[in-house]
Amino acid sequence: MKKLVNFHKEPRPRACDLVAAWPGIGNLSLIVTRYLREKLAAEEIGEIEPFTFFDPIGVMVKDNIVETPQFPEGKFFYWHNTAGKKDILFFISDEQPSYKGYELANFILDVSKKFKVQRVYTFAAAIAKIHHTEQPKVWGVATDTSLVAFLKKYDVVLRGRLQIAGLNGLLLGVARERAMEGICLLGEVPSYTTRIPNPKAALAVLKVLLQVLEIEIDLSELAKIAEESDQQMKRLAAQAMGEYIDRYTRPVWPPLEDEGEFEDEEEEEEE
């Protein structure tokens, strides 16, 4: 393990939860996790050696000089809960590996055992047929029926059957393989906004997470960002509507150039 991760500090908690995040649709997982980490002032304690899990696919060039290959970062952070409840171990990664996701998920859980992690939390986007002005709902899934019953205490939609792509879902599958508790909270995002960050959905997820973890942080900054993002989503909604009209509708009258030709023909007949 020490060859794959470098720890600057190794806390020894009595009990801990893991909050892990990788990039995904709407950047939801990273927004939730980074915001929570920053507000809790969680301390960076280590990072993984990326060579085992990632392969560079190119290089950057600056002033006509090729730079050395760059690897994505995957860092661990730690927050001590002074209220006497469970601490939080964070893992945040810049990228998802192309083909070694299963190995990385197992490795993250190996590290988690070292910190006495009892439950794993991940987050993802749920693409839904909603308008960006609607309040997004939060869906929930878990690794066993007792946790599903636990989620019923909160404002969470239990959809029953769905698929979670990438490490934000795979980590929970591996957690179940290893008989570890795990919960994934998914925020609804409109289908036409999947390519941009969605702080509004992230805010909805974070509100539920804070209730589950029984901790409090200031959400005003994220709420302001979510409000500002509505303008960008409004433009995307208009664009999506225009594309829909172009693709699925036809004009009920002839094009203007056709009308002109028809009028010319009439004039010739009159002569």
Question: Which stretches of residues belong to each language-model region?
Answer:
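Catalytic cores of processing enzymes, dominated by hydrolases/peptidases
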Residues: K129-L210, Y248-P251
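N-terminal short beta-loop-beta anion/metal-coordinating cradle
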Residues: M1-S93
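Fold-independent oxyanion-binding glycine-rich loops
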Residues: A21-G24, I92-E95, F123-A126, G187-E188
